[in-house]
Design a protein with these regions (language model features):
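Glycine-rich phosphate- or other oxyanion-binding loops that anchor nucleotides, phosphorylated ligands
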Residues: 12-171
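Single conserved hydrophobic/aromatic residue that forms the stacking wall/gate
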Residues: 1-11
Length: 171
């Protein structure tokens, strides 16, 4: 939150803290939309990489809900029952992200480039509300047995990169 205030002051963008997990992400994204009526939402957060070549600050192009599993009912892993699409995209280049409400320390069933706990939820809100969405994730760990320690060691490193990225984005 202190870095959020610095970025708000310098780049004249409204920055909201949305919390951890899909429920917090949806609730706080909807509150921010109601309060500010944005044309675009930009999400920044940490993610674990399932590909050792993916490091640093990356932009996400495609979003999946990795912990949605109604496969016993005949649906694909990641597919919400009675909805056709299992992915959300906004037409940008980038990596794939699987969102779920668990911190990943082993390879999940639905394989994506990176994993997080909020992006799909915000992307879905934006898609349903017809709001453009961009998402940048700082790779804090490799979503493996060392993920907890790596995340603790690396989480603060992404803040500076995000502030730099915000400054480089066009309105």
């Amino acid at each position: 939150p202190s870095q959020s205030s610095a970025a708000s002051d310098v780049y004249k963008r409204q920055i909201e803290y949305i919390g951890v997990g899909k429920v917090n992400a949806v609730f706080n994204a909807l509150n921010a939309i109601k309060k500010h009526s944005p044309k675009q939402i930009i999400n920044f957060g940490t993610a674990g990489s399932l590909d050792a070549k993916i490091k640093g600050l990356v932009e996400v192009s495609t979003f999946f809900q990795r912990d949605m599993d109604a496969s016993p009912l005949g649906f694909k892993v990641g597919q919400t029952p009675f909805e056709e699409d299992i992915e959300i995209t906004f037409g940008r280049e980038g990596v794939t992200c699987g969102t779920g409400d668990m911190f990943v320390t082993t390879t999940p069933t639905l394989k994506t480039d990176i994993v997080d706990m909020e992006a799909f939820a915000i992307a879905k809100v934006c898609k349903l509300k017809n709001i453009d969405f961009r998402c940048f994730k700082f790779i804090s760990d490799n979503a493996d047995s060392e993920a907890k320690n790596d995340w603790v060691d690396n989480v603060s490193l992404g803040a500076k990169l995000f502030i730099e990225k915000i400054g480089s984005l066009k309105d």
